[in-house]
A protein has these predicted regions:
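Short Gly/Pro-enriched turn/cap motifs at secondary-structure boundaries
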Residues: 6-7, 91, 111-113
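Histidine-centered catalytic micro-motifs
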Residues: 52-62, 110-119, 172-178
Length: 185
């Protein structure tokens, strides 16, 4: 799986463009940054954007959904809990351990509540990487902010879901808070 990061948004947010090199099928992890650079890159690589994954529904991770939908009307929106009244048509609610293809690449959905009830991570076993949203950052765990956050759920998500992945798994988090954008578990 190929990965390209784009930094911007409100607080060093990161959106990731992921794609299958053999089929050119692509997805975006979080609609967190202005889409102009992403579109330019998609066009330069002749990629076919199919899916937009939302790691959780905090505004800084969903701000550019409509901009992406305007450019890519067929785009399927994928997240743990996506009510039609909030996200409109062509959305897909994901479940824990669900397998999602991007071309020949496979992502496994990991429900990781705590930072927010609908938080998910996306694990690519073959390339040993995980997109963690705000559940885990480089050098530290995510945090609990607001009434819907739950420290016990976050603890369980970290210790019972993420830290059981192979230790060489590379973390791609939702913000660039660390000394580098990604790091192994």
């Amino acid at each position: 799986m190929k990965i390209k990061s784009f930094i911007g948004g409100f607080d060093k947010n990161i959106s990731y463009l992921i794609w299958c090199e053999s089929t050119r099928r692509a997805g975006i992890v979080d609609a967190a940054v202005d889409i102009s650079e992403i579109i330019e890159f998609i066009e330069s690589k002749n990629l076919i954007l199919e899916k937009l994954f939302i790691t959780h529904s905090h505004f800084d991770h969903i701000k550019y959904i409509e901009d992406l939908r305007d450019q890519f009307p067929q785009l399927q929106l994928c997240g743990y809990y996506l009510p039609e009244e909030d996200f409109g048509v062509n959305h897909r609610g994901l479940t824990h351990h669900e397998i999602i293809p991007i071309g020949t690449e496979i992502l496994t959905v990991l429900h990781t509540p705590g930072h927010y009830p609908d938080s998910i991570c996306l694990w690519n076993k073959k390339d040993n990487c995980v997109f963690t949203g705000d559940t885990m950052f480089v050098g530290r765990t995510g945090r609990t902010i607001g009434a819907k956050s739950n420290i016990s759920h976050l603890y369980n998500s970290i210790y019972e879901t993420l830290l059981i992945l192979p230790p060489q798994t590379i973390i791609y988090s939702g913000h660039h808070y660390g000394f580098k954008k990604s790091i192994s578990l």
